[in-house]
């Protein structure tokens, strides 16, 4: 026996040299070789897909099957030694065709098919197994389930015999074929039985030998017990037949080699000629013997797994179900391919997933550049690679596994896609808010009017365009989840909400600016009205021109002034709000808030004027205007004969009438509070709690306040009125006493003898004046001037001016003296000793000075507010 050392048997150590000439698929102990896939990879058959062919050889033991395969395909199967007769091939061996062309010099038409795999099956009828035909049947079933062509190796003299012609083996083949067909009615697989008649002498024509074999085969087929529904089936329904004769290898070696070369040309792809049909309409085979219908449609990369599954079913005496095995193989291989594809997919997508997860964890989602193209390419390559490798397997399983793979890929891509849209959504909202705010601030800095609605519309359009651009860039074609219309609608809705919120915020800022404008205007106007109290009778507080207002109509003027100011503010608010594209409801809420806040401003200003110090000052000014000035506004010079008591009483009682007048906000025309509740109006239905939370409750308007409109209009309480009355009377009494003292102080009691003494002692001077015209003229001018001054009531102002001048001179003298003392050491010591001896005196004039200073500061604040709100 000649054995080649470069064969890989079951259990051999993995070595590339062992695969050089073949591999043992199944050993004599019926063990399957797990290294079959390695051999196919070594021979580069795995990537062939369906472009491979499998041939099995049957025949009796020691009939030259291995020799035939070695001669025909250039393989190196072990052959029997000529010196002994014994079993050579044990189990099932497999090798790839090493003979690509039938002979050198032949054209490409004679080239053998690519990737021909040849299985050398253990011979039958051997003495080693004896009557044990279990392996014979199992090997036949395995070969039939995997092979396209079954070569039956027989000698010419065995034709017509039963055992010698392997008819028993063929009967087994037919039986297992029916068994397979019963399980696989959908595909109806066919096989080619290729009879190679050895030691063919040519005495008996090959056609006669062919007829004999076909008759024997038909007889065997007809004798089979066929399953239900297949009773009338014919052998040609499942098998095609081919025949070839080879001369004796030893006696006719050259002719044997030549016939083998010719025979090898038939092992290529063929087809059926529709113009040459048999009785059943089946076209004759033209060209090579490999027809597509013979192929078991098992991809080369899955053949090892498929063959192992088939053998496992066979060796365990289970019903062999080829469709199920094909499905199981498809599931196994598709899962393997899917895992391999996902590895490459992970390499392309995982970096983006990591970046996105990191950004989300940091709370700052980012739009990833190049994500869309990366997802499209990764998905396309993954699906394409899967299709290339897995589409050759069972269609239903392939489609199912492809769908599962796409689901896995799409689930991850969808998460990335939605994360990208979420980041675009968030960044777009932020950029939209910042852009609108920046545009508004720029408009405010320019000092020009700006159209808020136009700004929002422009920025919203840009934001949507940017979002759509980023969304389109992330779209993966042919996926349902790539439709971003829902996210776009949500984004547009959020932009609307943000725009609305920005508009409401801007309207609140507008309302604040208008409120400051109202506060500034009301502050100035109310100051003028309250400063004019007492000017109705003339005096220092009376206006120089126009009508002199009456105290009785004070609240009417205040209410009219307030309403007119707020109406002007409402007009300004409405005009500016129109540029915000604000709704009617929003404008109504803004106006309602403006009226309420304006009333709060007015009430605060009135409360400021009604402070104890301020109101006492107003009452004193009013009293002094009536007491110290006449109806023409001329200051009174009190004389002993003046009726000071009656003037004082009238002035005091007139001023006391102001206290109840000022204590309640009442209109003189109606003698009732102004209609504040109607003027403010009901709360708009569109007002939100946020619109009301910063508003001060108003009595008579807010039911929950618990105060009536009458109480809201009460400016001075009863206790405060009584206190003001008492304190005012004390102040008025002081003024009266001062006036009385002034009148009494003007009375002089000159004794009569004083005039005689004056005449006696001043006679010389009198004579000198009378004799000197210059002196006399000067005396005359002085007398006339004094008379005119008296008639014009100018002595009082002259005296005051003199006193003021003297006071100014005194202050200047003190300043010069202080500077002198500070410049000398003695002066500094004297000043140090005098510290702590000064006391402060407070009277109503000091209060007036403080009020004036406070008014100045208030005016400054009003001026500042007015400067801020010049645009209104």
From Swiss-Prot:
Coiled-coil ranges from the UniProt annotation: 482-504
Name of the gene: SEY1
GB1/RHD3-type G domain residues: 49-307
Name listed for the protein in its UniProt record: Protein SEY1
Gene3D superfamilies per record: P-loop containing nucleotide triphosphate hydrolases (3.40.50.300)
Keywords: Coiled coil, Endoplasmic reticulum, GTP-binding, Hydrolase, Membrane, Nucleotide-binding, Transmembrane, Transmembrane helix
Chain ranges on the Lumenal side, renumbered to this chain: 771-773
Enzyme class: hydrolase
InterPro entries the record matches: G_GB1_RHD3_dom, P-loop_NTPase, RHD3/Sey1, Sey1/RHD3-like_3HB
Comp. bias (Acidic residues): 690-704
Gene Ontology CC: endoplasmic reticulum membrane
Binding site for GTP: 59-66
Role played: Cooperates with the reticulon proteins and tubule-shaping DP1 family proteins to generate and maintain the structure of the tubular endoplasmic reticulum network. Has GTPase activity, which is required for its function in ER organization.
Region feature (Disordered): 676-704, 849-872
Topology with respect to the bilayer: Multi-pass membrane protein
Compartments in which it is found: Endoplasmic reticulum membrane
Membrane spanning stretches: 750-770, 774-794
Protein family per UniProt: Belongs to the TRAFAC class dynamin-like GTPase superfamily. GB1/RHD3 GTPase family. RHD3 subfamily.
One annotated GO molecular function: GTPase activity
Organism of derivation: Paracoccidioides brasiliensis (strain Pb18)
């Amino acid at each position: 026996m000649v054995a080649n050392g470069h064969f890989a048997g079951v259990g051999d150590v993995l070595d590339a040299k062992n695969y050089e000439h073949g591999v043992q698929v199944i050993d004599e102990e019926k063990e399957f070789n797990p290294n079959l896939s390695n051999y196919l990879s070594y021979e580069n058959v795995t990537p062939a897909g369906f472009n491979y062919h499998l041939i099995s050889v049957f025949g009796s033991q020691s009939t030259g099957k291995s020799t035939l395969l070695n001669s025909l395909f250039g393989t190196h199967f072990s052959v029997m030694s000529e010196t002994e007769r014994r079993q050579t091939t044990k189990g099932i061996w497999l090798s790839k065709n090493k003979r690509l062309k039938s002979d050198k010099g032949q054209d490409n038409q004679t080239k053998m098919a690519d990737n021909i795999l040849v299985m050398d099956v253990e011979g039958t009828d051997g003495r080693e197994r004896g009557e044990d035909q279990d392996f014979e049947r199992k090997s036949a079933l395995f070969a039939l389930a995997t092979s396209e062509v079954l070569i039956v190796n027989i000698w010419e003299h065995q034709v017509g015999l039963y055992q010698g012609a392997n008819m028993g083996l063929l009967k087994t083949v037919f039986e297992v074929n029916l068994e397979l067909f019963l399980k696989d009615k959908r595909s109806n697989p066919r096989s080619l039985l290729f009879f190679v008649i050895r030691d063919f002498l040519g005495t008996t024509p090959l056609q006669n030998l062919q007829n004999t074999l076909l008759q024997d085969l038909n007889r065997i087929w007809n004798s089979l017990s066929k399953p239900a529904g297949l009773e009338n089936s014919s052998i040609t329904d499942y098998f095609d037949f081919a025949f070839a004769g080879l001369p004796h290898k030893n006696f006719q070696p050259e002719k044997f080699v030549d016939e083998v070369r010719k025979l090898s040309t038939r092992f290529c792809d063929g087809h059926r000629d529709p113009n040459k049909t048999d009785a059943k309409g089946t076209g004759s085979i033209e060209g090579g013997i490999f027809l597509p219908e013979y192929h078991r449609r098992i991809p080369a990369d899955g053949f090892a797994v498929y063959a192992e599954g088939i053998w496992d079913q066979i060796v365990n005496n289970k019903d062999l179900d080829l469709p199920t095995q094909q499905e199981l193989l498809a599931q196994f291989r598709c899962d393997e391919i899917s895992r391999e594809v996902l590895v490459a997919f992970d390499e392309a997508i995982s970096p983006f997933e990591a970046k996105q997860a990191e950004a989300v964890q940091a709370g700052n989602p980012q739009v990833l550049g190049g994500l869309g193209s990366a997802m499209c390419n990764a998905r396309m390559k993954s699906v394409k690679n899967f299709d290339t490798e897995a589409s050759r397997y069972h269609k239903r399983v392939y489609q199912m596994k492809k769908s599962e793979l796409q689901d896995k890929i799409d689930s991850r891509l969808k998460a990335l896609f939605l994360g990208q849209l979420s980041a675009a959504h968030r960044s777009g909202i932020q950029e939209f808010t910042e852009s609108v705010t920046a545009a508004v601030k720029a408009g405010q800095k320019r000092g020009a009017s700006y159209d808020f609605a136009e700004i929002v519309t422009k920025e919203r359009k840009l934001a949507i365009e940017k979002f759509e651009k980023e969304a389109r860039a992330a779209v993966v074609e042919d996926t349902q989840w790539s439709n971003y219309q829902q996210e776009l609608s949500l984004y547009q809705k959020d932009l609307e909400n943000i725009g609305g919120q920005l508009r409401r915020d801007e309207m609140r800022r507008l309302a604040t600016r208008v409120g400051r404008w109202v506060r500034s205007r009301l502050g100035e106007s109310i100051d003028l009205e309250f400063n004019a109290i007492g000017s109705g009778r003339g005096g220092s507080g009376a206006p120089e021109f126009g009508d002199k207002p009456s105290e009785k109509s004070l609240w009417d003027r205040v209410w009219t002034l307030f309403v007119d100011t707020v109406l002007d503010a409402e007009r300004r608010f409405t005009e500016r709000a129109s540029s915000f594209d604000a709704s009617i409801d929003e404008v109504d809420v803004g106006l309602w808030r403006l009226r309420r806040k304006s009333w709060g401003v007015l009430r605060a200003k009135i409360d400021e004027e009604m402070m104890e110090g301020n109101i006492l000052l107003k009452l004193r000014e009013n009293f002094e205007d009536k007491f110290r000035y006449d109806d023409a506004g001329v200051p009174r010079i009190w004389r002993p004969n003046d009726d000071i008591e009656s003037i004082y009483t009238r002035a005091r009682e007139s001023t006391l009438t102001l206290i109840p007048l000022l204590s309640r906000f009442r209109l003189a025309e109606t003698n009732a509070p102004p209609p504040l509740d109607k003027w403010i109006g009901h709360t708009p239905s569109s007002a939100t709690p946020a619109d009301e939370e910063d508003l001060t409750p108003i009595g008579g308007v807010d039911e929950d306040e618990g105060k009536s409109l009458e109480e809201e209009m009460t400016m001075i309480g009863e206790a405060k009125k009584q206190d003001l009355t008492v304190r005012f009377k004390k102040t008025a009494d002081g003024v009266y006493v001062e006036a009385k003292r002034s009148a009494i102080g003007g009375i002089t009691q000159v004794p009569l003898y004083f005039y005689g003494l004056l005449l006696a002692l001043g006679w010389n001077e009198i004579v000198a004046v009378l004799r000197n015209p210059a002196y006399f003229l000067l005396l005359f001018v002085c007398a006339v001037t004094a008379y005119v001054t008296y008639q014009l009531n100018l002595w009082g102002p002259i005296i005051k001016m003199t006193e003021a001048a003297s006071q100014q001179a005194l202050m200047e003298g003190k300043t010069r003296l202080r500077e002198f003392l500070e410049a000398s050491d003695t002066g500094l010591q004297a000043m140090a000793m005098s510290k702590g001896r000064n006391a402060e005196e407070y009277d109503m004039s000091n209060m007036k000075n403080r009020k004036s200073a406070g008014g100045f500061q208030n005016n400054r604040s009003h001026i500042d507010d007015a400067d801020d709100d010049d645009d209104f």
